[in-house]
Amino acid sequence: MRGGTVLLILILLLGVIARSPMTALAAASILALSYLGWGGLLEWIEQNGVDTGLIMLTLAMLAPFATGKVGLREVLLSFASLPGIIAVIGGVLATNLNKRGIDLLSGEPQIIVGMIVGSLLGIVLFGGIPVGPLMAGGLTALILQIYGWLSK
């Protein structure tokens, strides 16, 4: 059994134990695609999965505009409120962290397992929600940068 397969089985088991259906389903899906010999699809997922996932997430965030649940008036009013202004600042900070996460994951893909384990611990211990490795990667990059500053 290849090392990658063992890791995927371990992640699948951790996902089940931690009651993280997204993690378990993702690991099981990749294992199934691997065993079915669908290497081309695996390569496509590896190359395009993050962008595709971000598109789906963005679609979900924009859907309320199309359904009429959020209109121009609500958007304009949100910019005039403290929570709305803080949300804009939060969006700026989050996108910066997400970019750092992508950079970290691109340069050090082996760090993904630690982030998955950390995400699962966050689910089990704190009732967290795994929204993906980008924010975890961004926070990891930020913590590593702070550690680098402090260790000088």
Swiss-Prot record:
Write out the GO cellular component annotations.
plasma membrane
Pfam families assigned: DUF441
Chief subcellular location equals: membrane
Asked whether the keyword Transmembrane is assigned, the reply is: yes
Membrane spanning residue stretches:
6-26, 52-72, 75-95, 111-131, 132-152
- Among its keywords, does the record have Transmembrane helix? yes
What is the membrane topology noted in the UniProt record heading this document?
Multi-pass membrane protein
| Subcellular compartments | Cell membrane
| Source organism superkingdom | Bacteria
Keywords, ordered alphabetically: Cell membrane, Membrane, Transmembrane, Transmembrane helix
Q: InterPro entries in the record, alphabetically?
A: UPF0756_TM
Entry's family note: Belongs to the UPF0756 family.
* PANTHER family for the chain: UPF0756 MEMBRANE PROTEIN YEAL (PTHR38452:SF1)
Please give the name of this protein. UPF0756 membrane protein Helmi_09930
Gene source species: Heliobacterium modesticaldum (strain ATCC 51547 / Ice1)
